[in-house]
C-alpha cells in the first residue's frame, strides 16, 4: 500500500488548528516542523528552566500530514481549511511515500558511530565494532542525543578528555542521557542529569539502565544544591545565555564547564555572557558548531 504526504506551509497561529482538522478528517498522522529549519531564520522552541514551552509551532510552520492512497489531498486540505475558518486553501505540495519495512529502514539509517579516541555509540541491533572500547548502547528515540549531531559529538570528545575518576558531573539539558552516561563510564561519581522534559528524563533513565550506568535524573526543581567538578550543557545559545548565572554557580571554584548547541557565529556572544563567571573560550569547532569550555575562577 502506498501513502502520500501533504505538505503545507503557513503561519504559526493556524498550524495547530489545521493539524487537528486534518487528523479529524482522516489523516494517519500529522507533524509540525519549522519551515525555516537549517537556515539562519531557524527558531528553536524552548522553555525557561522548569517550564514547558508556551508555543507549539513556529512563526513559519510546515504541517506534514500522512494520508492513505484513497484520500485526495486537495479535497482533504480544502475541507480542513474550511473547518478552521481560513478564507483560502493554503498552497501545498504532495509527495508519494512507498510502503516499506519501516523498522528495517530505520535501523539501516543508524550505524555504530565512532567518537573521539575510544568511544562507540552503538544501536541495540548492532554488535560493538570494538568490545574493548568505551561502548554506549543507544537507540534513536524521542529525546535528543545519539552522538550523530555535531554538538553531541563535541561534548562527548570534551568529556572523554576532561573527566577524571571520582569527579562529580552535572549534565544540564540531558536529553537522552548520552553525556551523563558517558561521564559515568569515564569514572565520574556522582553524575546528575537534568532536563525540562519529563519524557526526556524517563528516556535517559531507561538508557542508563541499559548501559548499567548509575545516574540520577530529574526535572530542574530536583537539581541538587551544591557545586560540581564538571558542568556540561548541550542546549541552544539563547537558553544558555539566560541560564549563565545559574550554570556557572553550579561549578566548583577551579571546576570546569562545557557548553554546546552554539553556532560558530554565536560563540563570542555566549562567551561574553559567561566571562563574568568563568574563563571561557572555544574549545573546538565542528561543522559550524562549537563547544565552549572554561574554568570557574577561584574565590578570593
Curated annotation (Swiss-Prot):
* Record EC number: 2.1.1.-
- Output the Gene Ontology cellular-component terms: cytosol
Extract the InterPro entries matched here. Ribosomal_L11_MeTrfase_PrmA (IPR050078), Ribosomal_PrmA_MeTrfase (IPR004498), SAM-dependent_MTases_sf (IPR029063)
Q: Could you give a GO molecular-function term held by this entry?
A: protein-lysine N-methyltransferase activity
Q: What does the UniProt entry say about where the protein is found?
A: Cytoplasm
Query: Which residues are noted in the entry as S-adenosyl-L-methionine-binding?
Result: 152, 173, 195, 234
Which Pfam families does the UniProt entry name for this protein? Answer: PrmA (PF06325)
Give the UniProt keywords, A-Z: Cytoplasm, Methyltransferase, S-adenosyl-L-methionine, Transferase
The EC category is transferase
Isomerase listed as a keyword: no
Q: Which GO terms describe its biological process?
A: methylation
The answer, when asked if Cytoplasm is one of the entry's keywords, is yes
Q: Which reaction does it catalyse?
A: L-lysyl-[protein] + 3 S-adenosyl-L-methionine = N(6),N(6),N(6)-trimethyl-L-lysyl-[protein] + 3 S-adenosyl-L-homocysteine + 3 H(+)
Q: List the disulfide bonds.
A: none
Instruction: Cite the PANTHER family for this sequence.
Output: ELECTRON TRANSFER FLAVOPROTEIN BETA SUBUNIT LYSINE METHYLTRANSFERASE
Q: Which family does it belong to?
A: Belongs to the methyltransferase superfamily. PrmA family.
**Function of this protein?**
Methylates ribosomal protein L11.
Name of protein? Ribosomal protein L11 methyltransferase
Q: Which organism is it from?
A: Burkholderia cenocepacia (strain HI2424)
